[in-house]
Amino acid sequence: NRQLTEKGLKVEKASAAVVDATIIQTAGSKQRQAIEVDEEGQVSGQTTPSKDSDARWIKKNGLYKLGYKQHTRTDAEGYIEKLHITPANAHECKHLSPLLEGIAEGTTVYADKGYDSAENRQHLKEHQLLDGIMRKACRNRPLTEAQTKRNRYLSKTRYVVEQSFGTLHRKFRYARAAYFGLIKVSAQSHLKAMCLNLLKAANRLSA
C-alpha cells in the first residue's frame, strides 16, 4: 500500500475506514451432514470429521459453512488496508478494535449492525474516531425513523468493502481456502489482499 500511495494510486490518509467480515470456507470437499451448530461453533450431531482442526462452523444465509472469518478494513476506495483471520464462529463485534490500529484521528469508521455495541462506540470516542456504525434494533426497542434513515445513508458508503469481497470471491476464487490451518489461511488472505489492491491500481491506471 505504501508503494501505491507513493505512485499516487491510493490516498495517503483516507478520511474513511470501512469495516466488514467475510467467510472463507476451509480447504477440501464440502461437508453436508451438519445439522446444528452450538455457541462454540461445533456441530451437534454426527458429521464427517474435518481435517482442519482450526476451522469452525457457522450458519450464514441459511447454510452451514466450515471455515474462517476474514475481518477486513478498507479505505473509501475499497483498497484493503488491514485484515486478520479468526475461526468462522468468532463474532465480528469483538474484532473491531484490532482493525482500527494506525488510522488517523478524525477518520470516520463505517460498519454494519454486527459491530453495534457500547464498547465499540466507546473505543471510537476514546481514539477520536467518528462513529459510522449502523444501529441495531433491540427486542421491544425498534429503531427510530431517524436511526433508520441514518442506517440507509451509512449503507451507501459500506458498499466498497462488499465490492472488494466480491472481487476476492469471483476474480481471485477466494471463497474457499487452499490450505488447512489458521496460519496458512491468514497468509493466503494477505496475499489475496495484495493482489486485489494491485488490480485496483492497474484498473485506475488504465481508466
Where are these regions (language model features)?
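Short hydrophobic/aromatic-enriched beta-strand-loop microsegments
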Residues: 127-135
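Short secondary-structure boundary segments
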Residues: 112-113, 135-136, 163
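Short, acidic/turn-prone active-site loops that include or flank metal/cofactor-
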Residues: 85-87, 135-139
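Residue-level "edge-of-site" marker
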Residues: 17, 137, 182
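Short, charged, surface-exposed secondary-structure boundary motifs
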Residues: 94, 119, 139-147
